[in-house]
C-alpha cells in the first residue's frame, strides 16, 4: 500500500533457432543450454503424465475427457498422452482444446472449429470456437466423469491456457465432475514478478488476482484457485494433482515442444514476460518473422535504432502487427539466458520504444486499451507516459508481490 501511495505521489510530481514458416511441431524446442544449466538438470524431470501408476487407478472404469494440445507428450518417447490413454484402455469420450487448437497451429485468438481426432475418432470440443459456452454447459460436461489436464503452460498471467483450465474447473465444480491435473514444470517458475491483476480489468488475458509472472505450475495454481475460492461462486472443485518428479522452482526446464506458434524456443519463452506488453501498443514484437517475441520495432523508430525486420504473413501469424512494414528496433535473440533471468520481467523495452516514438512526436496512440488488460493495472501505463523510471514503476508492485508469495506458500508442491 505504501508503494502504491508513492506511485500516486510520483504522478503528481511528474511499460534463432526456429523459423515458424517451416517449424515441425513434433521435433521439439531449441535446447541451447549453458554448461552451468546442463549440470543443473542432470536428473531428468518426470512429468505428471508419465506417472501412470498414480492416475490410471483414479480413472479406471470412468468416462474421461482430456484437456490438452500438441504439448501433451509423455516422456522421452514423445508419444502423445491421448495415444497412451487409448492404448491403456481408458474410456476416452472427449478432447477439449485451448487457444491455437489441439494441434497448436492456429493464430493467437483465432476461432478454432470443433472437429474429430482423425487417429482415434474422439470428438474435439474447441473452447476457442463458436460453441464455447455450449461446451462449458451441462450437456458437454455430462459427456465425462473425469477431466484430465495435460498441457504445457509458461507461467504468465496473460498466457491463456490457465484461463481455459479455470473455466473448465468452474464447469466441473458446478456439475460435480472430478479434475485431475498431470502437472508439468513451469519454464518461468524460478521467480515471481509484475503487478497483481486489478479484478476490474479481468479479461481473457487476466483471470485471477495474481502477478504477471506467478512462478507456479498449473497444478499449484489450480490448488490456489480452489483454496482461495477464486472459482465462480466460490464453488469447490474435486481436484487431484499428479506432481512432477526431480523438479524444483529453480530447475531451468527446456520444453520438448513449442507451447504455441509464436513461442518457438526458450529465448522467446524467457523474453515473453517482457515483450508481451507490446501486444498492447502499436509496436511489433516480431510476430510474422523468424524471431517472434525476440525483437521489437516500429517504422517510426528509425532515428533510434538501425536494426530492422519486416513482419510477413506466416502460419501462426497470418495478420501480424505492421504486416509488410519495415520496422526498426532491437534484436534480443542472442541475449544470454542468464541475463534474461536476472532482469526478470523488464519494462525497459516498452519504455525505450515509448521514448523513441515520443522523441519523433509519435507517442499519441502508442498504447491501446489492451495494454492495461495485459499489465493488470493502469498505473504502469500512466507512469511510463509520465516518464517515470523502471525502478520507480517496479517499486509499486514489490509489496503486493511479497504478500502474494506468502499467500501462495501452502499451495506449492515443489521447493
Regions found by a protein language model. Give the residues of each.
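Glycine-rich oxoanion-binding loops at beta->alpha junctions
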Residues: 113-144, 156
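Conserved functional hotspot residues or short segments at active or partner-binding sites
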Residues: 292, 296-398
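Conserved anion/nucleotide-ligand pocket segment
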Residues: 202-273
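Glycine-rich, aromatic-lined ligand/substrate-binding cores of catalytic
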Residues: 245-325
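Short internal beta-strands
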Residues: 91-99, 182
Amino acid at each position: 500500500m505504501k508503494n502504491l501511495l508513492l506511485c500516486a505521489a510520483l504522478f503528481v510530481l511528474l511499460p534463432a533457432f526456429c523459423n515458424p514458416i517451416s517449424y515441425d511441431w513434433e521435433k521439439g524446442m531449441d535446447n541451447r543450454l549453458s554448461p552451468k544449466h546442463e549440470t543443473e538438470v542432470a536428473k531428468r524431470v518426470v512429468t505428471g503424465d508419465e506417472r501412470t501408476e498414480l492416475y490410471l487407478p483414479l480413472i479406471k472404469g470412468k468416462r474421461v475427457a482430456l484437456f490438452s494440445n500438441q504439448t501433451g507428450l509423455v516422456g522421452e518417447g514423445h508419444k502423445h498422452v491421448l495415444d497412451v490413454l487409448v492404448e491403456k484402455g481408458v474410456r476416452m469420450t472427449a478432447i477439449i482444446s485451448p487457444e491455437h487448437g489441439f494441434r497448436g497451429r492456429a493464430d493467437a485468438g483465432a476461432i478454432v472449429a470443433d472437429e474429430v481426432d482423425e487417429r482415434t475418432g474422439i470428438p474435439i470440443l474447441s473452447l476457442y470456437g463458436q460453441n464455447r459456452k455450449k461446451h462449458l454447459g451441462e450437456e458437454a460436461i455430462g459427456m465425462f466423469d473425469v477431466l484430465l489436464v495435460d498441457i504445457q503452460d509458461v507461467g504468465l498471467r496473460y498466457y491463456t491456457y490457465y484461463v481455459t483450465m479455470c473455466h473448465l474447473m468452474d464447469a466441473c465444480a458446478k456439475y460435480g465432475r472430478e479434475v485431475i491435473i498431470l502437472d508439468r514444470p513451469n519454464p518461468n517458475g524460478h521467480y515471481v514478478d509484475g503487478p497483481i491483476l486489478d479484478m476490474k480489468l479481468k479479461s481473457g488475458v487476466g483471470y485471477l488476482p495474481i502477478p504477471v509472472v506467478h512462478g507456479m505450475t498449473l497444478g499449484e495454481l489450480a490448488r490456489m484457485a480452489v483454496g482461495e475460492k477464486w472459482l465462480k461462486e466460490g464453488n469447490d472443485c474435486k481436484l487431484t494433482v499428479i506432481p512432477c518428479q526431480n523438479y524444483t522452482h529453480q530447475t531451468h526446464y527446456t520444453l520438448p515442444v513449442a507451447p504455441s506458434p509464436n513461442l518457438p524456443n526458450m529465448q522467446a519463452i524467457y523474453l515473453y514476460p517482457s515483450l508481451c506488453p507490446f501486444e498492447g501498443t502499436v509496436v511489433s514484437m516480431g510476430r510474422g518473422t523468424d524471431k517472434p517475441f525476440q525483437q521489437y520495432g516500429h517504422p517510426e523508430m528509425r532515428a533510434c535504432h538501425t536494426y530492422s525486420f519486416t513482419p510477413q504473413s506466416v502460419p501462426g501469424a497470418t495478420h501480424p502487427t505492421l504486416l509488410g512494414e519495415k520496422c526498426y528496433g532491437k534484436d534480443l535473440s542472442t541475449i544470454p539466458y542468464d541475463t534474461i533471468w536476472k532482469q526478470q520481467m523488464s519494462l525497459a523495452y516498452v519504455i525505450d520504444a515509448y521514448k523513441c516514438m515520443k522523441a519523433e512526436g509519435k507517442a499519441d496512440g502508442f498504447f491501446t486499451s489492451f495494454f492495461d488488460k495485459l499489465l493488470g493495472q493502469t498505473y504502469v501505463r500512466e507512469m511510463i507516459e509520465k516518464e517515470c523510471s523502471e525502478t520507480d514503476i517496479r517499486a509499486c508492485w514489490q509489496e503486493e508481490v511479497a504478500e502474494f508469495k506468502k499467500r501462495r506458500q501452502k499451495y506449492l508442491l515443489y521447493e
